[in-house]
A protein has these predicted regions:
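C-terminal-most transmembrane helix of multi-pass membrane proteins
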Residues: 1-5, 9-10, 43-48, 211-213, ...
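Juxtamembrane helix-entry segments on the extracytoplasmic side of multipass membrane proteins
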Residues: 8-12, 35-40, 44, 61-66, ...
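Specific transmembrane alpha-helical segments of multi-pass solute transporters/efflux pumps
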Residues: 22, 26-27, 55-99, 106-109, ...
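Hydrophobic/aromatic residues within transmembrane alpha-helices
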Residues: 33, 42, 86, 91, ...
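Helix-helix packing/entry segments at the starts of transmembrane helices
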Residues: 43-45, 81, 95-101, 164-188, ...
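Transmembrane alpha-helical segments that form core, pore/gating elements
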Residues: 51-54, 106-107, 143-201, 215, ...
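C-terminal transmembrane-helix exit sites in multi-pass transporters
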Residues: 53-61, 83, 102-124, 251-271
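Hydrophobic transmembrane alpha-helices of multi-pass small-molecule transport proteins
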Residues: 54, 70, 76, 118-138, ...
Length: 303
């Protein structure tokens, strides 16, 4: 019996570590895909494919996701416009570290929107993350470029999305995949409308295999497999182990960006990234502890 439980624990940990690795690699993959097609077209294809694959989830009780999914999809549209444009304009390493700030920002957004005061330790995590951003963006020679600013905006919007998801889905039985389907449809439709309204519209679909391999990787692995693996593993691993494994995502992002794209972070950049990771791990470990009053597990799916 103990051997079986240990095997299940290792399997759960392996799945969570795989998800962190996939999500960490997604920044470099997206950066490469954007070499072949503009942001709006790339997002329209990526989320259009996700919507088509998840469409069966909207049958029966899945339709309950329509009402909350539409406004949440609009927020998600803003997130990915900022995030994907940010990935294009900054390094994949910076993008991976900066977007993880949403974990630290979320408790303070809950304080603002849901009137839930954060744990005192989270103020320390916030200070660590701010120091990390300062080091990551140049330290004394602060050079926050447009891409970094867009990634920070995306992190802030992700925190807003978490709070809105909890508020709009509280007390409702809504399938996570159905909610992701609606949100993906809204993002795809929004990008198509924005794209065709611009002068010249969207260019012809790219023919480069690298674009399609990258896009399919993001759809099949960064969204569908990641959701399956995360849902299957979360109930089998301890909160501390989950926090440590999922908090490794930005580290994987920086390593993959270095190996694949040739990006190099200096000592100051690595110090800043590690401070952000430390703040993220602190927030995750505190956030997973039982509390007398919670808003429920309404965090939106990563797409």
């Amino acid at each position: 019996m103990k051997g079986t439980l240990r095997q299940r624990l290792w399997l759960a940990d392996g799945m969570l570590l795989t998800v962190a690795l996939i999500w960490g690699s997604s920044y470099a993959v997206a950066k490469q895909a954007l070499l072949f097609y503009p942001v709006l077209g790339f997002l329209a294809i990526r989320f259009g494919l996700t919507f088509v694959l998840l469409l069966p989830q909207l049958r029966g009780t899945g339709r309950r996701a329509l009402r909350p999914g539409l406004p949440l999809g609009l927020v998600m549209l803003a997130i990915f416009l900022c995030e994907t444009s940010g990935v294009m304009l900054t390094s994949a390493s910076n993008a991976a570290f900066l977007i993880s700030l949403c974990v630290v920002i979320t408790p303070f957004m809950e304080w603002l929107l849901l009137r839930q005061r954060p744990h005192n330790m989270l103020f320390l995590a916030c200070a660590l993350s701010l120091a990390g951003v300062w080091l990551l963006t140049g330290g004394p020679q602060l050079s926050l470029n447009l891409g970094d600013a867009l990634m920070l905006a995306a992190a802030l919007l992700r925190a807003v999305l978490v709070c809105l998801t909890r508020r709009l889905t509280a007390g409702r039985e809504i399938l996570a995949l159905a909610l992701t389907a609606v949100q993906s449809g809204v993002v795809a439709a929004g990008c198509i409308l924005l794209g065709v309204s611009l002068p010249g519209g969207l260019p012809a679909l790219p023919v480069e295999p690298g674009f399609w391999f990258g896009t399919l990787y993001l759809v099949l692995f960064a969204t569908l497999f990641a959701m399956f693996a995360q849902n299957r593993a979360l109930g089998r691993s301890s909160a501390t182990r989950v926090s440590l494994l999922m908090g490794s995502e930005p580290l994987f992002g920086a390593i993959i960006a270095g190996l694949w794209l040739g990006e190099r972070l200096g000592p100051m950049g690595w110090a800043g990234g590690l401070l952000i990771m430390l703040a993220t791990l602190c927030t995750l470990s505190i956030g997973r502890q039982p509390a007398p009053s919670t808003a429920g597990d309404g965090a939106p799916a990563r797409a």
